[in-house]
UniProtKB/Swiss-Prot annotation:
Lineage of the species this protein comes from: Eukaryota, Metazoa, Chordata, Craniata, Vertebrata
Residue sites binding ATP per the record: 505-510, 545-552
Gene Ontology BP term (one): intra-Golgi vesicle-mediated transport
Gene designation: NSF
Cellular localisation: Cytoplasm
Descriptive protein name: Vesicle-fusing ATPase
Modified residues (Phosphotyrosine): 259
Length: 744
């Protein structure tokens, strides 16, 4: 039928505004009819009608959202004509609606169930016309929401005929809501509305993981396993849409503790996690920065760190973005409560504040706290429970594969600019740098670069660079090896100077007893390397004083080629209190546990224990500490060889320490004249004629002297004139009680 001219008016009541209907006088149209409103030849809008007596005949009243959508003004002349829906093609199957609070003042973070919303929507607007782009007001749970129709799909015609669905869906611009229509709600952009339930669209979520990162670009090497474990525990749940996480009843991990030796990449890893994630920049805080001299300020600093996350969670609920807070040196502020001296309790209240913020009464589900320390033993245990810093990840010394990755990263730029010589084999360097941390490998590359640069500096009165040669600057294999030899030593490696002084005269194999000790030592080394059943192997070298026990222990350790070798010797603990000794020993063993293969030589055990026979007196505190350390197995995947030395086996027997060692090897003195002559020949200090004279005196006779004492007597004799050397040597042997008294 032809359209009729009518005048646009304002909707008479608020209740009628919520019906989404255009309101007319019953003399013009009937309730439930549908009309097309033409505002211009090219603009037409479909409405469902409702009658009300207060509307003047010839007028049609619209709510504010309807007038905005159609671009109508009060009193505007419009053309209105009846419209009939083709129910075979225009019944709405699914409709996507964007929703937000109508008034921003009335926002809250309460969850709104979209399933109940959809049922209420169908009930309120059944048999009404809807168009794509239409705006309307929707009342639900005494709250007003602004709706915008985003998309409409027609119902499958087969369903209308009572046949099985064919799956055919057609997009339409205008449709009629029926009882079987499906409504999906979609939260408006930047809205704080918290939608739950199944009747909501899957949001186009930005992936939490940055798509263009890789380990090499991030400058992280040797941490592949650690990173994958962190991802599995801390980020996997955050990759999934909130609705799936909600259905599983899953809570995100809120905290990670990274611990390990200095220089192994804890801070680097935490710093790069922020770059890996499509999240806001992480807040990086050094532990001591939190502390403040004013009362209550330290706790306020903690609260400030979490303020943004709390505000956003209140506003956006489950759709809040991720807030990352990184604590470097977290042990500075999270020490065990009650462990600090003094009565102020400042540290304790800071710990309490942090505990309550991470997982307290008002739980935050949009934070990730990353703590870093090389002293995890100092941290309050309440911070380490699940719900707080529950993912504990050791960032240890890199293995050979990890060292290769790290060296590749630090030499990549040189390689790209052809400044790395062709003779540099990164694999060789990775093999040679056992127990180097990431920072030490970076230092090695830096030292090699400095060595190469130094070659091109002119040695004159002024410091000048030879620019001609500088053009051909190359960092060579020799530069790396020189830096490895002279400049960079690993903190958790083998310092040759530690044990070189113990074997500066070499090992004098004066007889089968010495060979047997070395062979047994080699067997124990192989057992430590190869056996999975005995990760801890300990041996006690016992024998009389000056028999060379320490030298043999140092030799066995050196020949093992273990990446970590340390000597725990009383000469490094002179003047230490008992507690300080225990701490020093514990540190050596703790460092050993960080290496894949380690050897610790515990030298002169009775001296470590402060043993003296008068009394007798010894330190029970050190004894108990040593017993525990000798029996404590290293962490899984680590192996430890302990070599102890003592001159008082009987004393250790009484102290029940012998049982702490896996085995005991006896190191004897030189006991026969033949062994003495063998030692003299190997040392080569006396001439053949002199040795013949000595042989006449000692051959076939019993002697008793330690190799260390023998060396001292020989050196003393050599200070005499040549004709008196032999006589002096024999006299010294007699005075030491090392030989029979019938020497001439």
């Amino acid at each position: 039928m032809a359209g009729r001219s009518m005048q646009a008016a304002r909707c008479p009541t608020d209740e009628l505004s919520l019906t989404n209907c255009a309101v007319v006088n019953e003399k013009d149209f009937q309730s439930g009819q549908h009309v097309i409103v033409r505002t211009s030849p090219n603009h037409r809008y479909t409405f469902t009608l409702k009658t009300h007596p207060s509307v003047v005949p010839g007028s049609i009243a619209f709510s504010l959202p309807q007038r905005k959508w159609a671009g109508l003004s009060i009193g505007q002349e419009i053309e209105v004509s009846l419209y009939t829906f083709d129910k075979a093609k225009q019944c709405i199957g699914t409709m996507t609606i964007e929703i937000d609070f109508l008034q921003k003042k009335s926002i809250d973070s309460n969850p709104y169930d979209t399933d109940k919303m959809a049922a209420e929507f169908i009930q309120q607007f059944n048999n009404q016309a809807f168009s794509v782009g239409q705006q309307l007001v929707f009342s639900f749970n005494e709250k007003l929401f602004g709706l915008l129709v985003k998309d409409i799909e027609a119902m499958d015609p087969s369903i209308l005929k009572g046949e099985p669905a064919t799956g055919k869906r057609q997009k339409i611009e205008v449709g009629l809501v029926v009882g079987n229509s499906q409504v999906a709600f979609e939260k408006a952009e930047n809205s704080s509305l918290n939608l739950i339930g199944k009747a909501k669209t899957k949001e186009n979520r930005q992936s939490i993981i940055n798509p263009d990162w890789n380990f090499e670009k991030m400058g992280i090497g040797g941490l592949d396993k650690e990173f994958s474990d962190i991802f599995r525990r801390a980020f996997a749940s955050r990759v999934f849409p909130p609705e799936i996480v909600e259905q599983m009843g899953c809570k995100h991990v809120k905290g990670i503790l990274l611990y390990g030796p200095p220089g192994c990449g804890k801070t680097l890893l935490a710093r790069q996690i922020g770059k890996m994630l499509n999240a806001r920049e992480p807040k990086v805080v050094n532990g001591p920065e939190i502390l403040n001299k004013y009362v209550g300020e330290s706790e306020a600093n903690i609260r400030k760190l979490f303020a943004d996350a709390e505000e956003e969670q209140r506003r956006l609920g489950a759709n809040s973005g991720l807030h990352i807070i990184i604590f470097d040196e977290i042990d500075a502020i999270c020490k065990q409560r009650g462990s600090m001296a003094g009565s102020t309790g400042v540290h304790d209240t800071v710990v309490n504040q942090l505990l309550s913020k991470i997982d307290g009464v008002e739980q935050l589900n949009n934070i990730l706290v990353i703590g870093m320390t090389n002293r995890p033993d100092l941290i309050d245990e309440a911070l380490l429970r699940p719900g707080r810093l529950e993912v504990k990840m050791e960032i240890g010394l890199p293995d050979e594969k990890g060292r290769l990755q790290i060296l590749h990263i630090h030499t990549a730029r040189m390689r790209g600019h052809q400044l790395l010589s062709a003779d540099v084999d990164i694999k060789e360097l990775a093999m040679e740098t056992k127990n180097f941390s990431g920072a030490e490998l970076e230092g090695l590359v830096r030292a090699a670069q400095s060595t190469a640069m130094n070659r091109h500096i002119k040695a004159s009165t002024k410091v000048e660079v030879d620019m001609e040669k500088a053009e051909s600057l190359q960092v060579t294999r020799g530069d790396f090896l020189a830096s490895l030899e002279n400049d960079i030593k690993p903190a958790f490696g083998t310092n040759q100077e530690d044990y070189a002084s113990y074997i500066m005269n070499g090992i004098i194999k004066w007889g089968d007893p010495v060979t047997r000790v070395l062979d047994d030592g080699e067997l124990l080394v192989q057992q430590t390397k190869n056996s999975d059943r005995t990760p801890l192997v300990s041996v006690l070298l016992e024998g009389p004083p000056h028999s060379g026990k320490t030298a043999l222990a140092a030799k066995i350790a050196e020949e093992s080629n273990f990446p970590f070798i340390k000597i725990c010797s009383p000469d490094k603990m002179i003047g230490f209190s008992e507690t300080a000794k225990c701490q020093a020993m514990k540190k050596i063993f703790d460092d050993a546990y960080k290496s894949q293969l380690s050897c610790v030589v515990v030298d002169d055990i009775e001296r470590l224990l402060d043993y003296v026979p008068i009394g007798p007196r010894f330190s029970n505190l050190v004894l108990q500490a040593l017993l525990v350390l000798l029996k404590k197995a290293p962490p899984q995947g680590r192996k430890l060889l302990i070599i102890g030395t003592t001159s008082r086996k009987d004393v250790l027997q009484e102290m029940e320490m012998l049982n702490a060692f896996s085995t005991t090897i006896h190191v004897p003195n030189i006991a026969t004249g033949e062994q003495l002559l063998e030692a003299l020949e190997l040392l080569g200090n006396f001439k053949d004629k002199e040795r013949t004279t000595i042989a006449q005196q000692v051959k076939g006779k019993k002697v008793w002297i330690g190799i260390k004492k023998l060396l001292m007597l020989i050196e003393m004799s050599l200070q005499m004139d040549p004709e008196y050397r032999v006589r002096k040597f024999l006299a010294l042997l007699r005075e030491e009680g090392a030989s029979p008294l019938d020497f001439d």
